[in-house]
């Protein structure tokens, strides 16, 4: 990973990146469907959602779907290749220029897909979102605070460190406060509206004089966190316990926060090596 020596900007996602938690998906779906569907249907839907997450269905992470027709598409470089219906049966391609395709990138995206399918009122979905996130900071469902990761990030020298999350305020800030990382990053962006938000950030970084090969983006959602930087010629790291049906060659890929800690350690080691080489020069 010689390219690590060239990195001067690191963009971190928050949810699914600085902590990993997949248990919330069950509670999120249950909160949306309770009082509208039977317990049996709720349980079946939760099972379906985890099967998608774990790659047990024809529909997988890394697929696109049409938010109106709820047809699914395997893809290469975000271009639809094959079409599937909700049951996972292959169907005729119906995508056109007007189709609004959504990338299934993470558990939050699976929950949004369920909300579409079950016709959950937006207000109910929003309340469930905030309620489940509030739970994630309580003792019963508490996310893991990986101080070893944050300490390793804080060791990075001569790097511009950015946290960009699509989570809005106040919940995004509440997670940052809980993780005690307010002093870890140079810039914070909440409600980042990725992927467009990260494209705009890249434009800003370019204006500041950074070159694409100096930028590393780390996240669990390929479409939101990685594709914009990858297409611009920058470096990317996918963090996900579960596989994505996506053939894109990211610069690095790790399955866990442990793997991310190892990557950041390598960055720190490469910085030390850089200083040694400069000293010899």
Ranges and model annotations:
Residues 25-33, 46, 104-112, 130, ...:
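An amphipathic alpha-helix signature
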Residues 1-65:
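Active-site neighborhood of HAD-like aspartate-dependent phosphohydrolases
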Residues 11, 104-108, 135-163, 199:
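Short, acidic loop-to-helix structural element flanking the phosphoryl-transfer center
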Residues 35-49, 118-130, 183:
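Short, surface-exposed acidic
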Residues 54-134:
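A metal-dependent, Asp-based hydrolase signature
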Residues 14-19, 139, 166, 219:
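Short, charged/polar micro-motifs that form catalytic or ligand-binding hotspots
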Residues 1-7, 38, 147-155, 162-281:
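Asp-based, Mg2+/Mn2+-dependent phosphohydrolase catalytic module
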